[in-house]
Amino acid sequence: MTNYLRLTPIFLVFILSSCSSIYIPSVPNTPMLTTQGEIAAGAHISLKGNFNFNSAYAVSNHFAVLANGAFLQNEKDKKDIKHKMIEIGGGYFKTFGPENNRILEIYAGLGSGKSDRLFRELDANKNILSIDHQKANYDKKFIQVNYSSKKVDNLKLFGVNFGLNYGTALRMSFINTNNFYINNVLQPNEDNIFLEPVFYTRMILSDEVQLQYTSGSNFGLKSRKFLNAGNSVFSVGAVVNLGRKPKK
């Protein structure tokens, strides 16, 4: 019985730590670019406090470059999580459909991230029974397809009409850990492939500024202990588009 009680905190910490993932997906960059010289920038935050920054620049009428970043620092009694990531990429965009109000974007890129997670098992008096400290770096490659429509639907809110745009993105992320430590002991690295479908809605405040709500899922194609699909995408933010040519 005594041995069982000693093992219980360790077992509970393992269960707790396996419920979340080293990898926290960022908000996909969905700039909805239309013309050369256009700049898009967005800032988003999730309920867990994951802050994301996305930017894009249309180098030509069909080619764009991207830069993204994410940062999270969440501290609680039983769990502290620190996570940061940067990405760069580029790709193709094209407008089509009635009045060219539909946009297809195909991007690819690479990035890197750092994860620092501390799990604590506490007793009824909040005394620490055990600690599990996990640190890892990881490399990321991704390919992403965005489809969006600039056809405007209307939402009446507080007596004011706001236009709405909709879009979806499907991202495939290839993640590999390196320098993965648990309690200062080097661990075998893990890899996984994540499918990340995302849907977003934009509320138009002006020609340049929109509010964006994003929701999506995260599916891991491989079974892994620590690099799993333990996090989804749910955020609100704002997007700015500058340099867009006016409609003729």
Task: Give the residues covered by each predicted segment.
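Bacterial signal peptide processing site
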Residues: 20-23
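Short boundary motifs at domain starts and secondary-structure transition points
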Residues: 29-34, 156-158
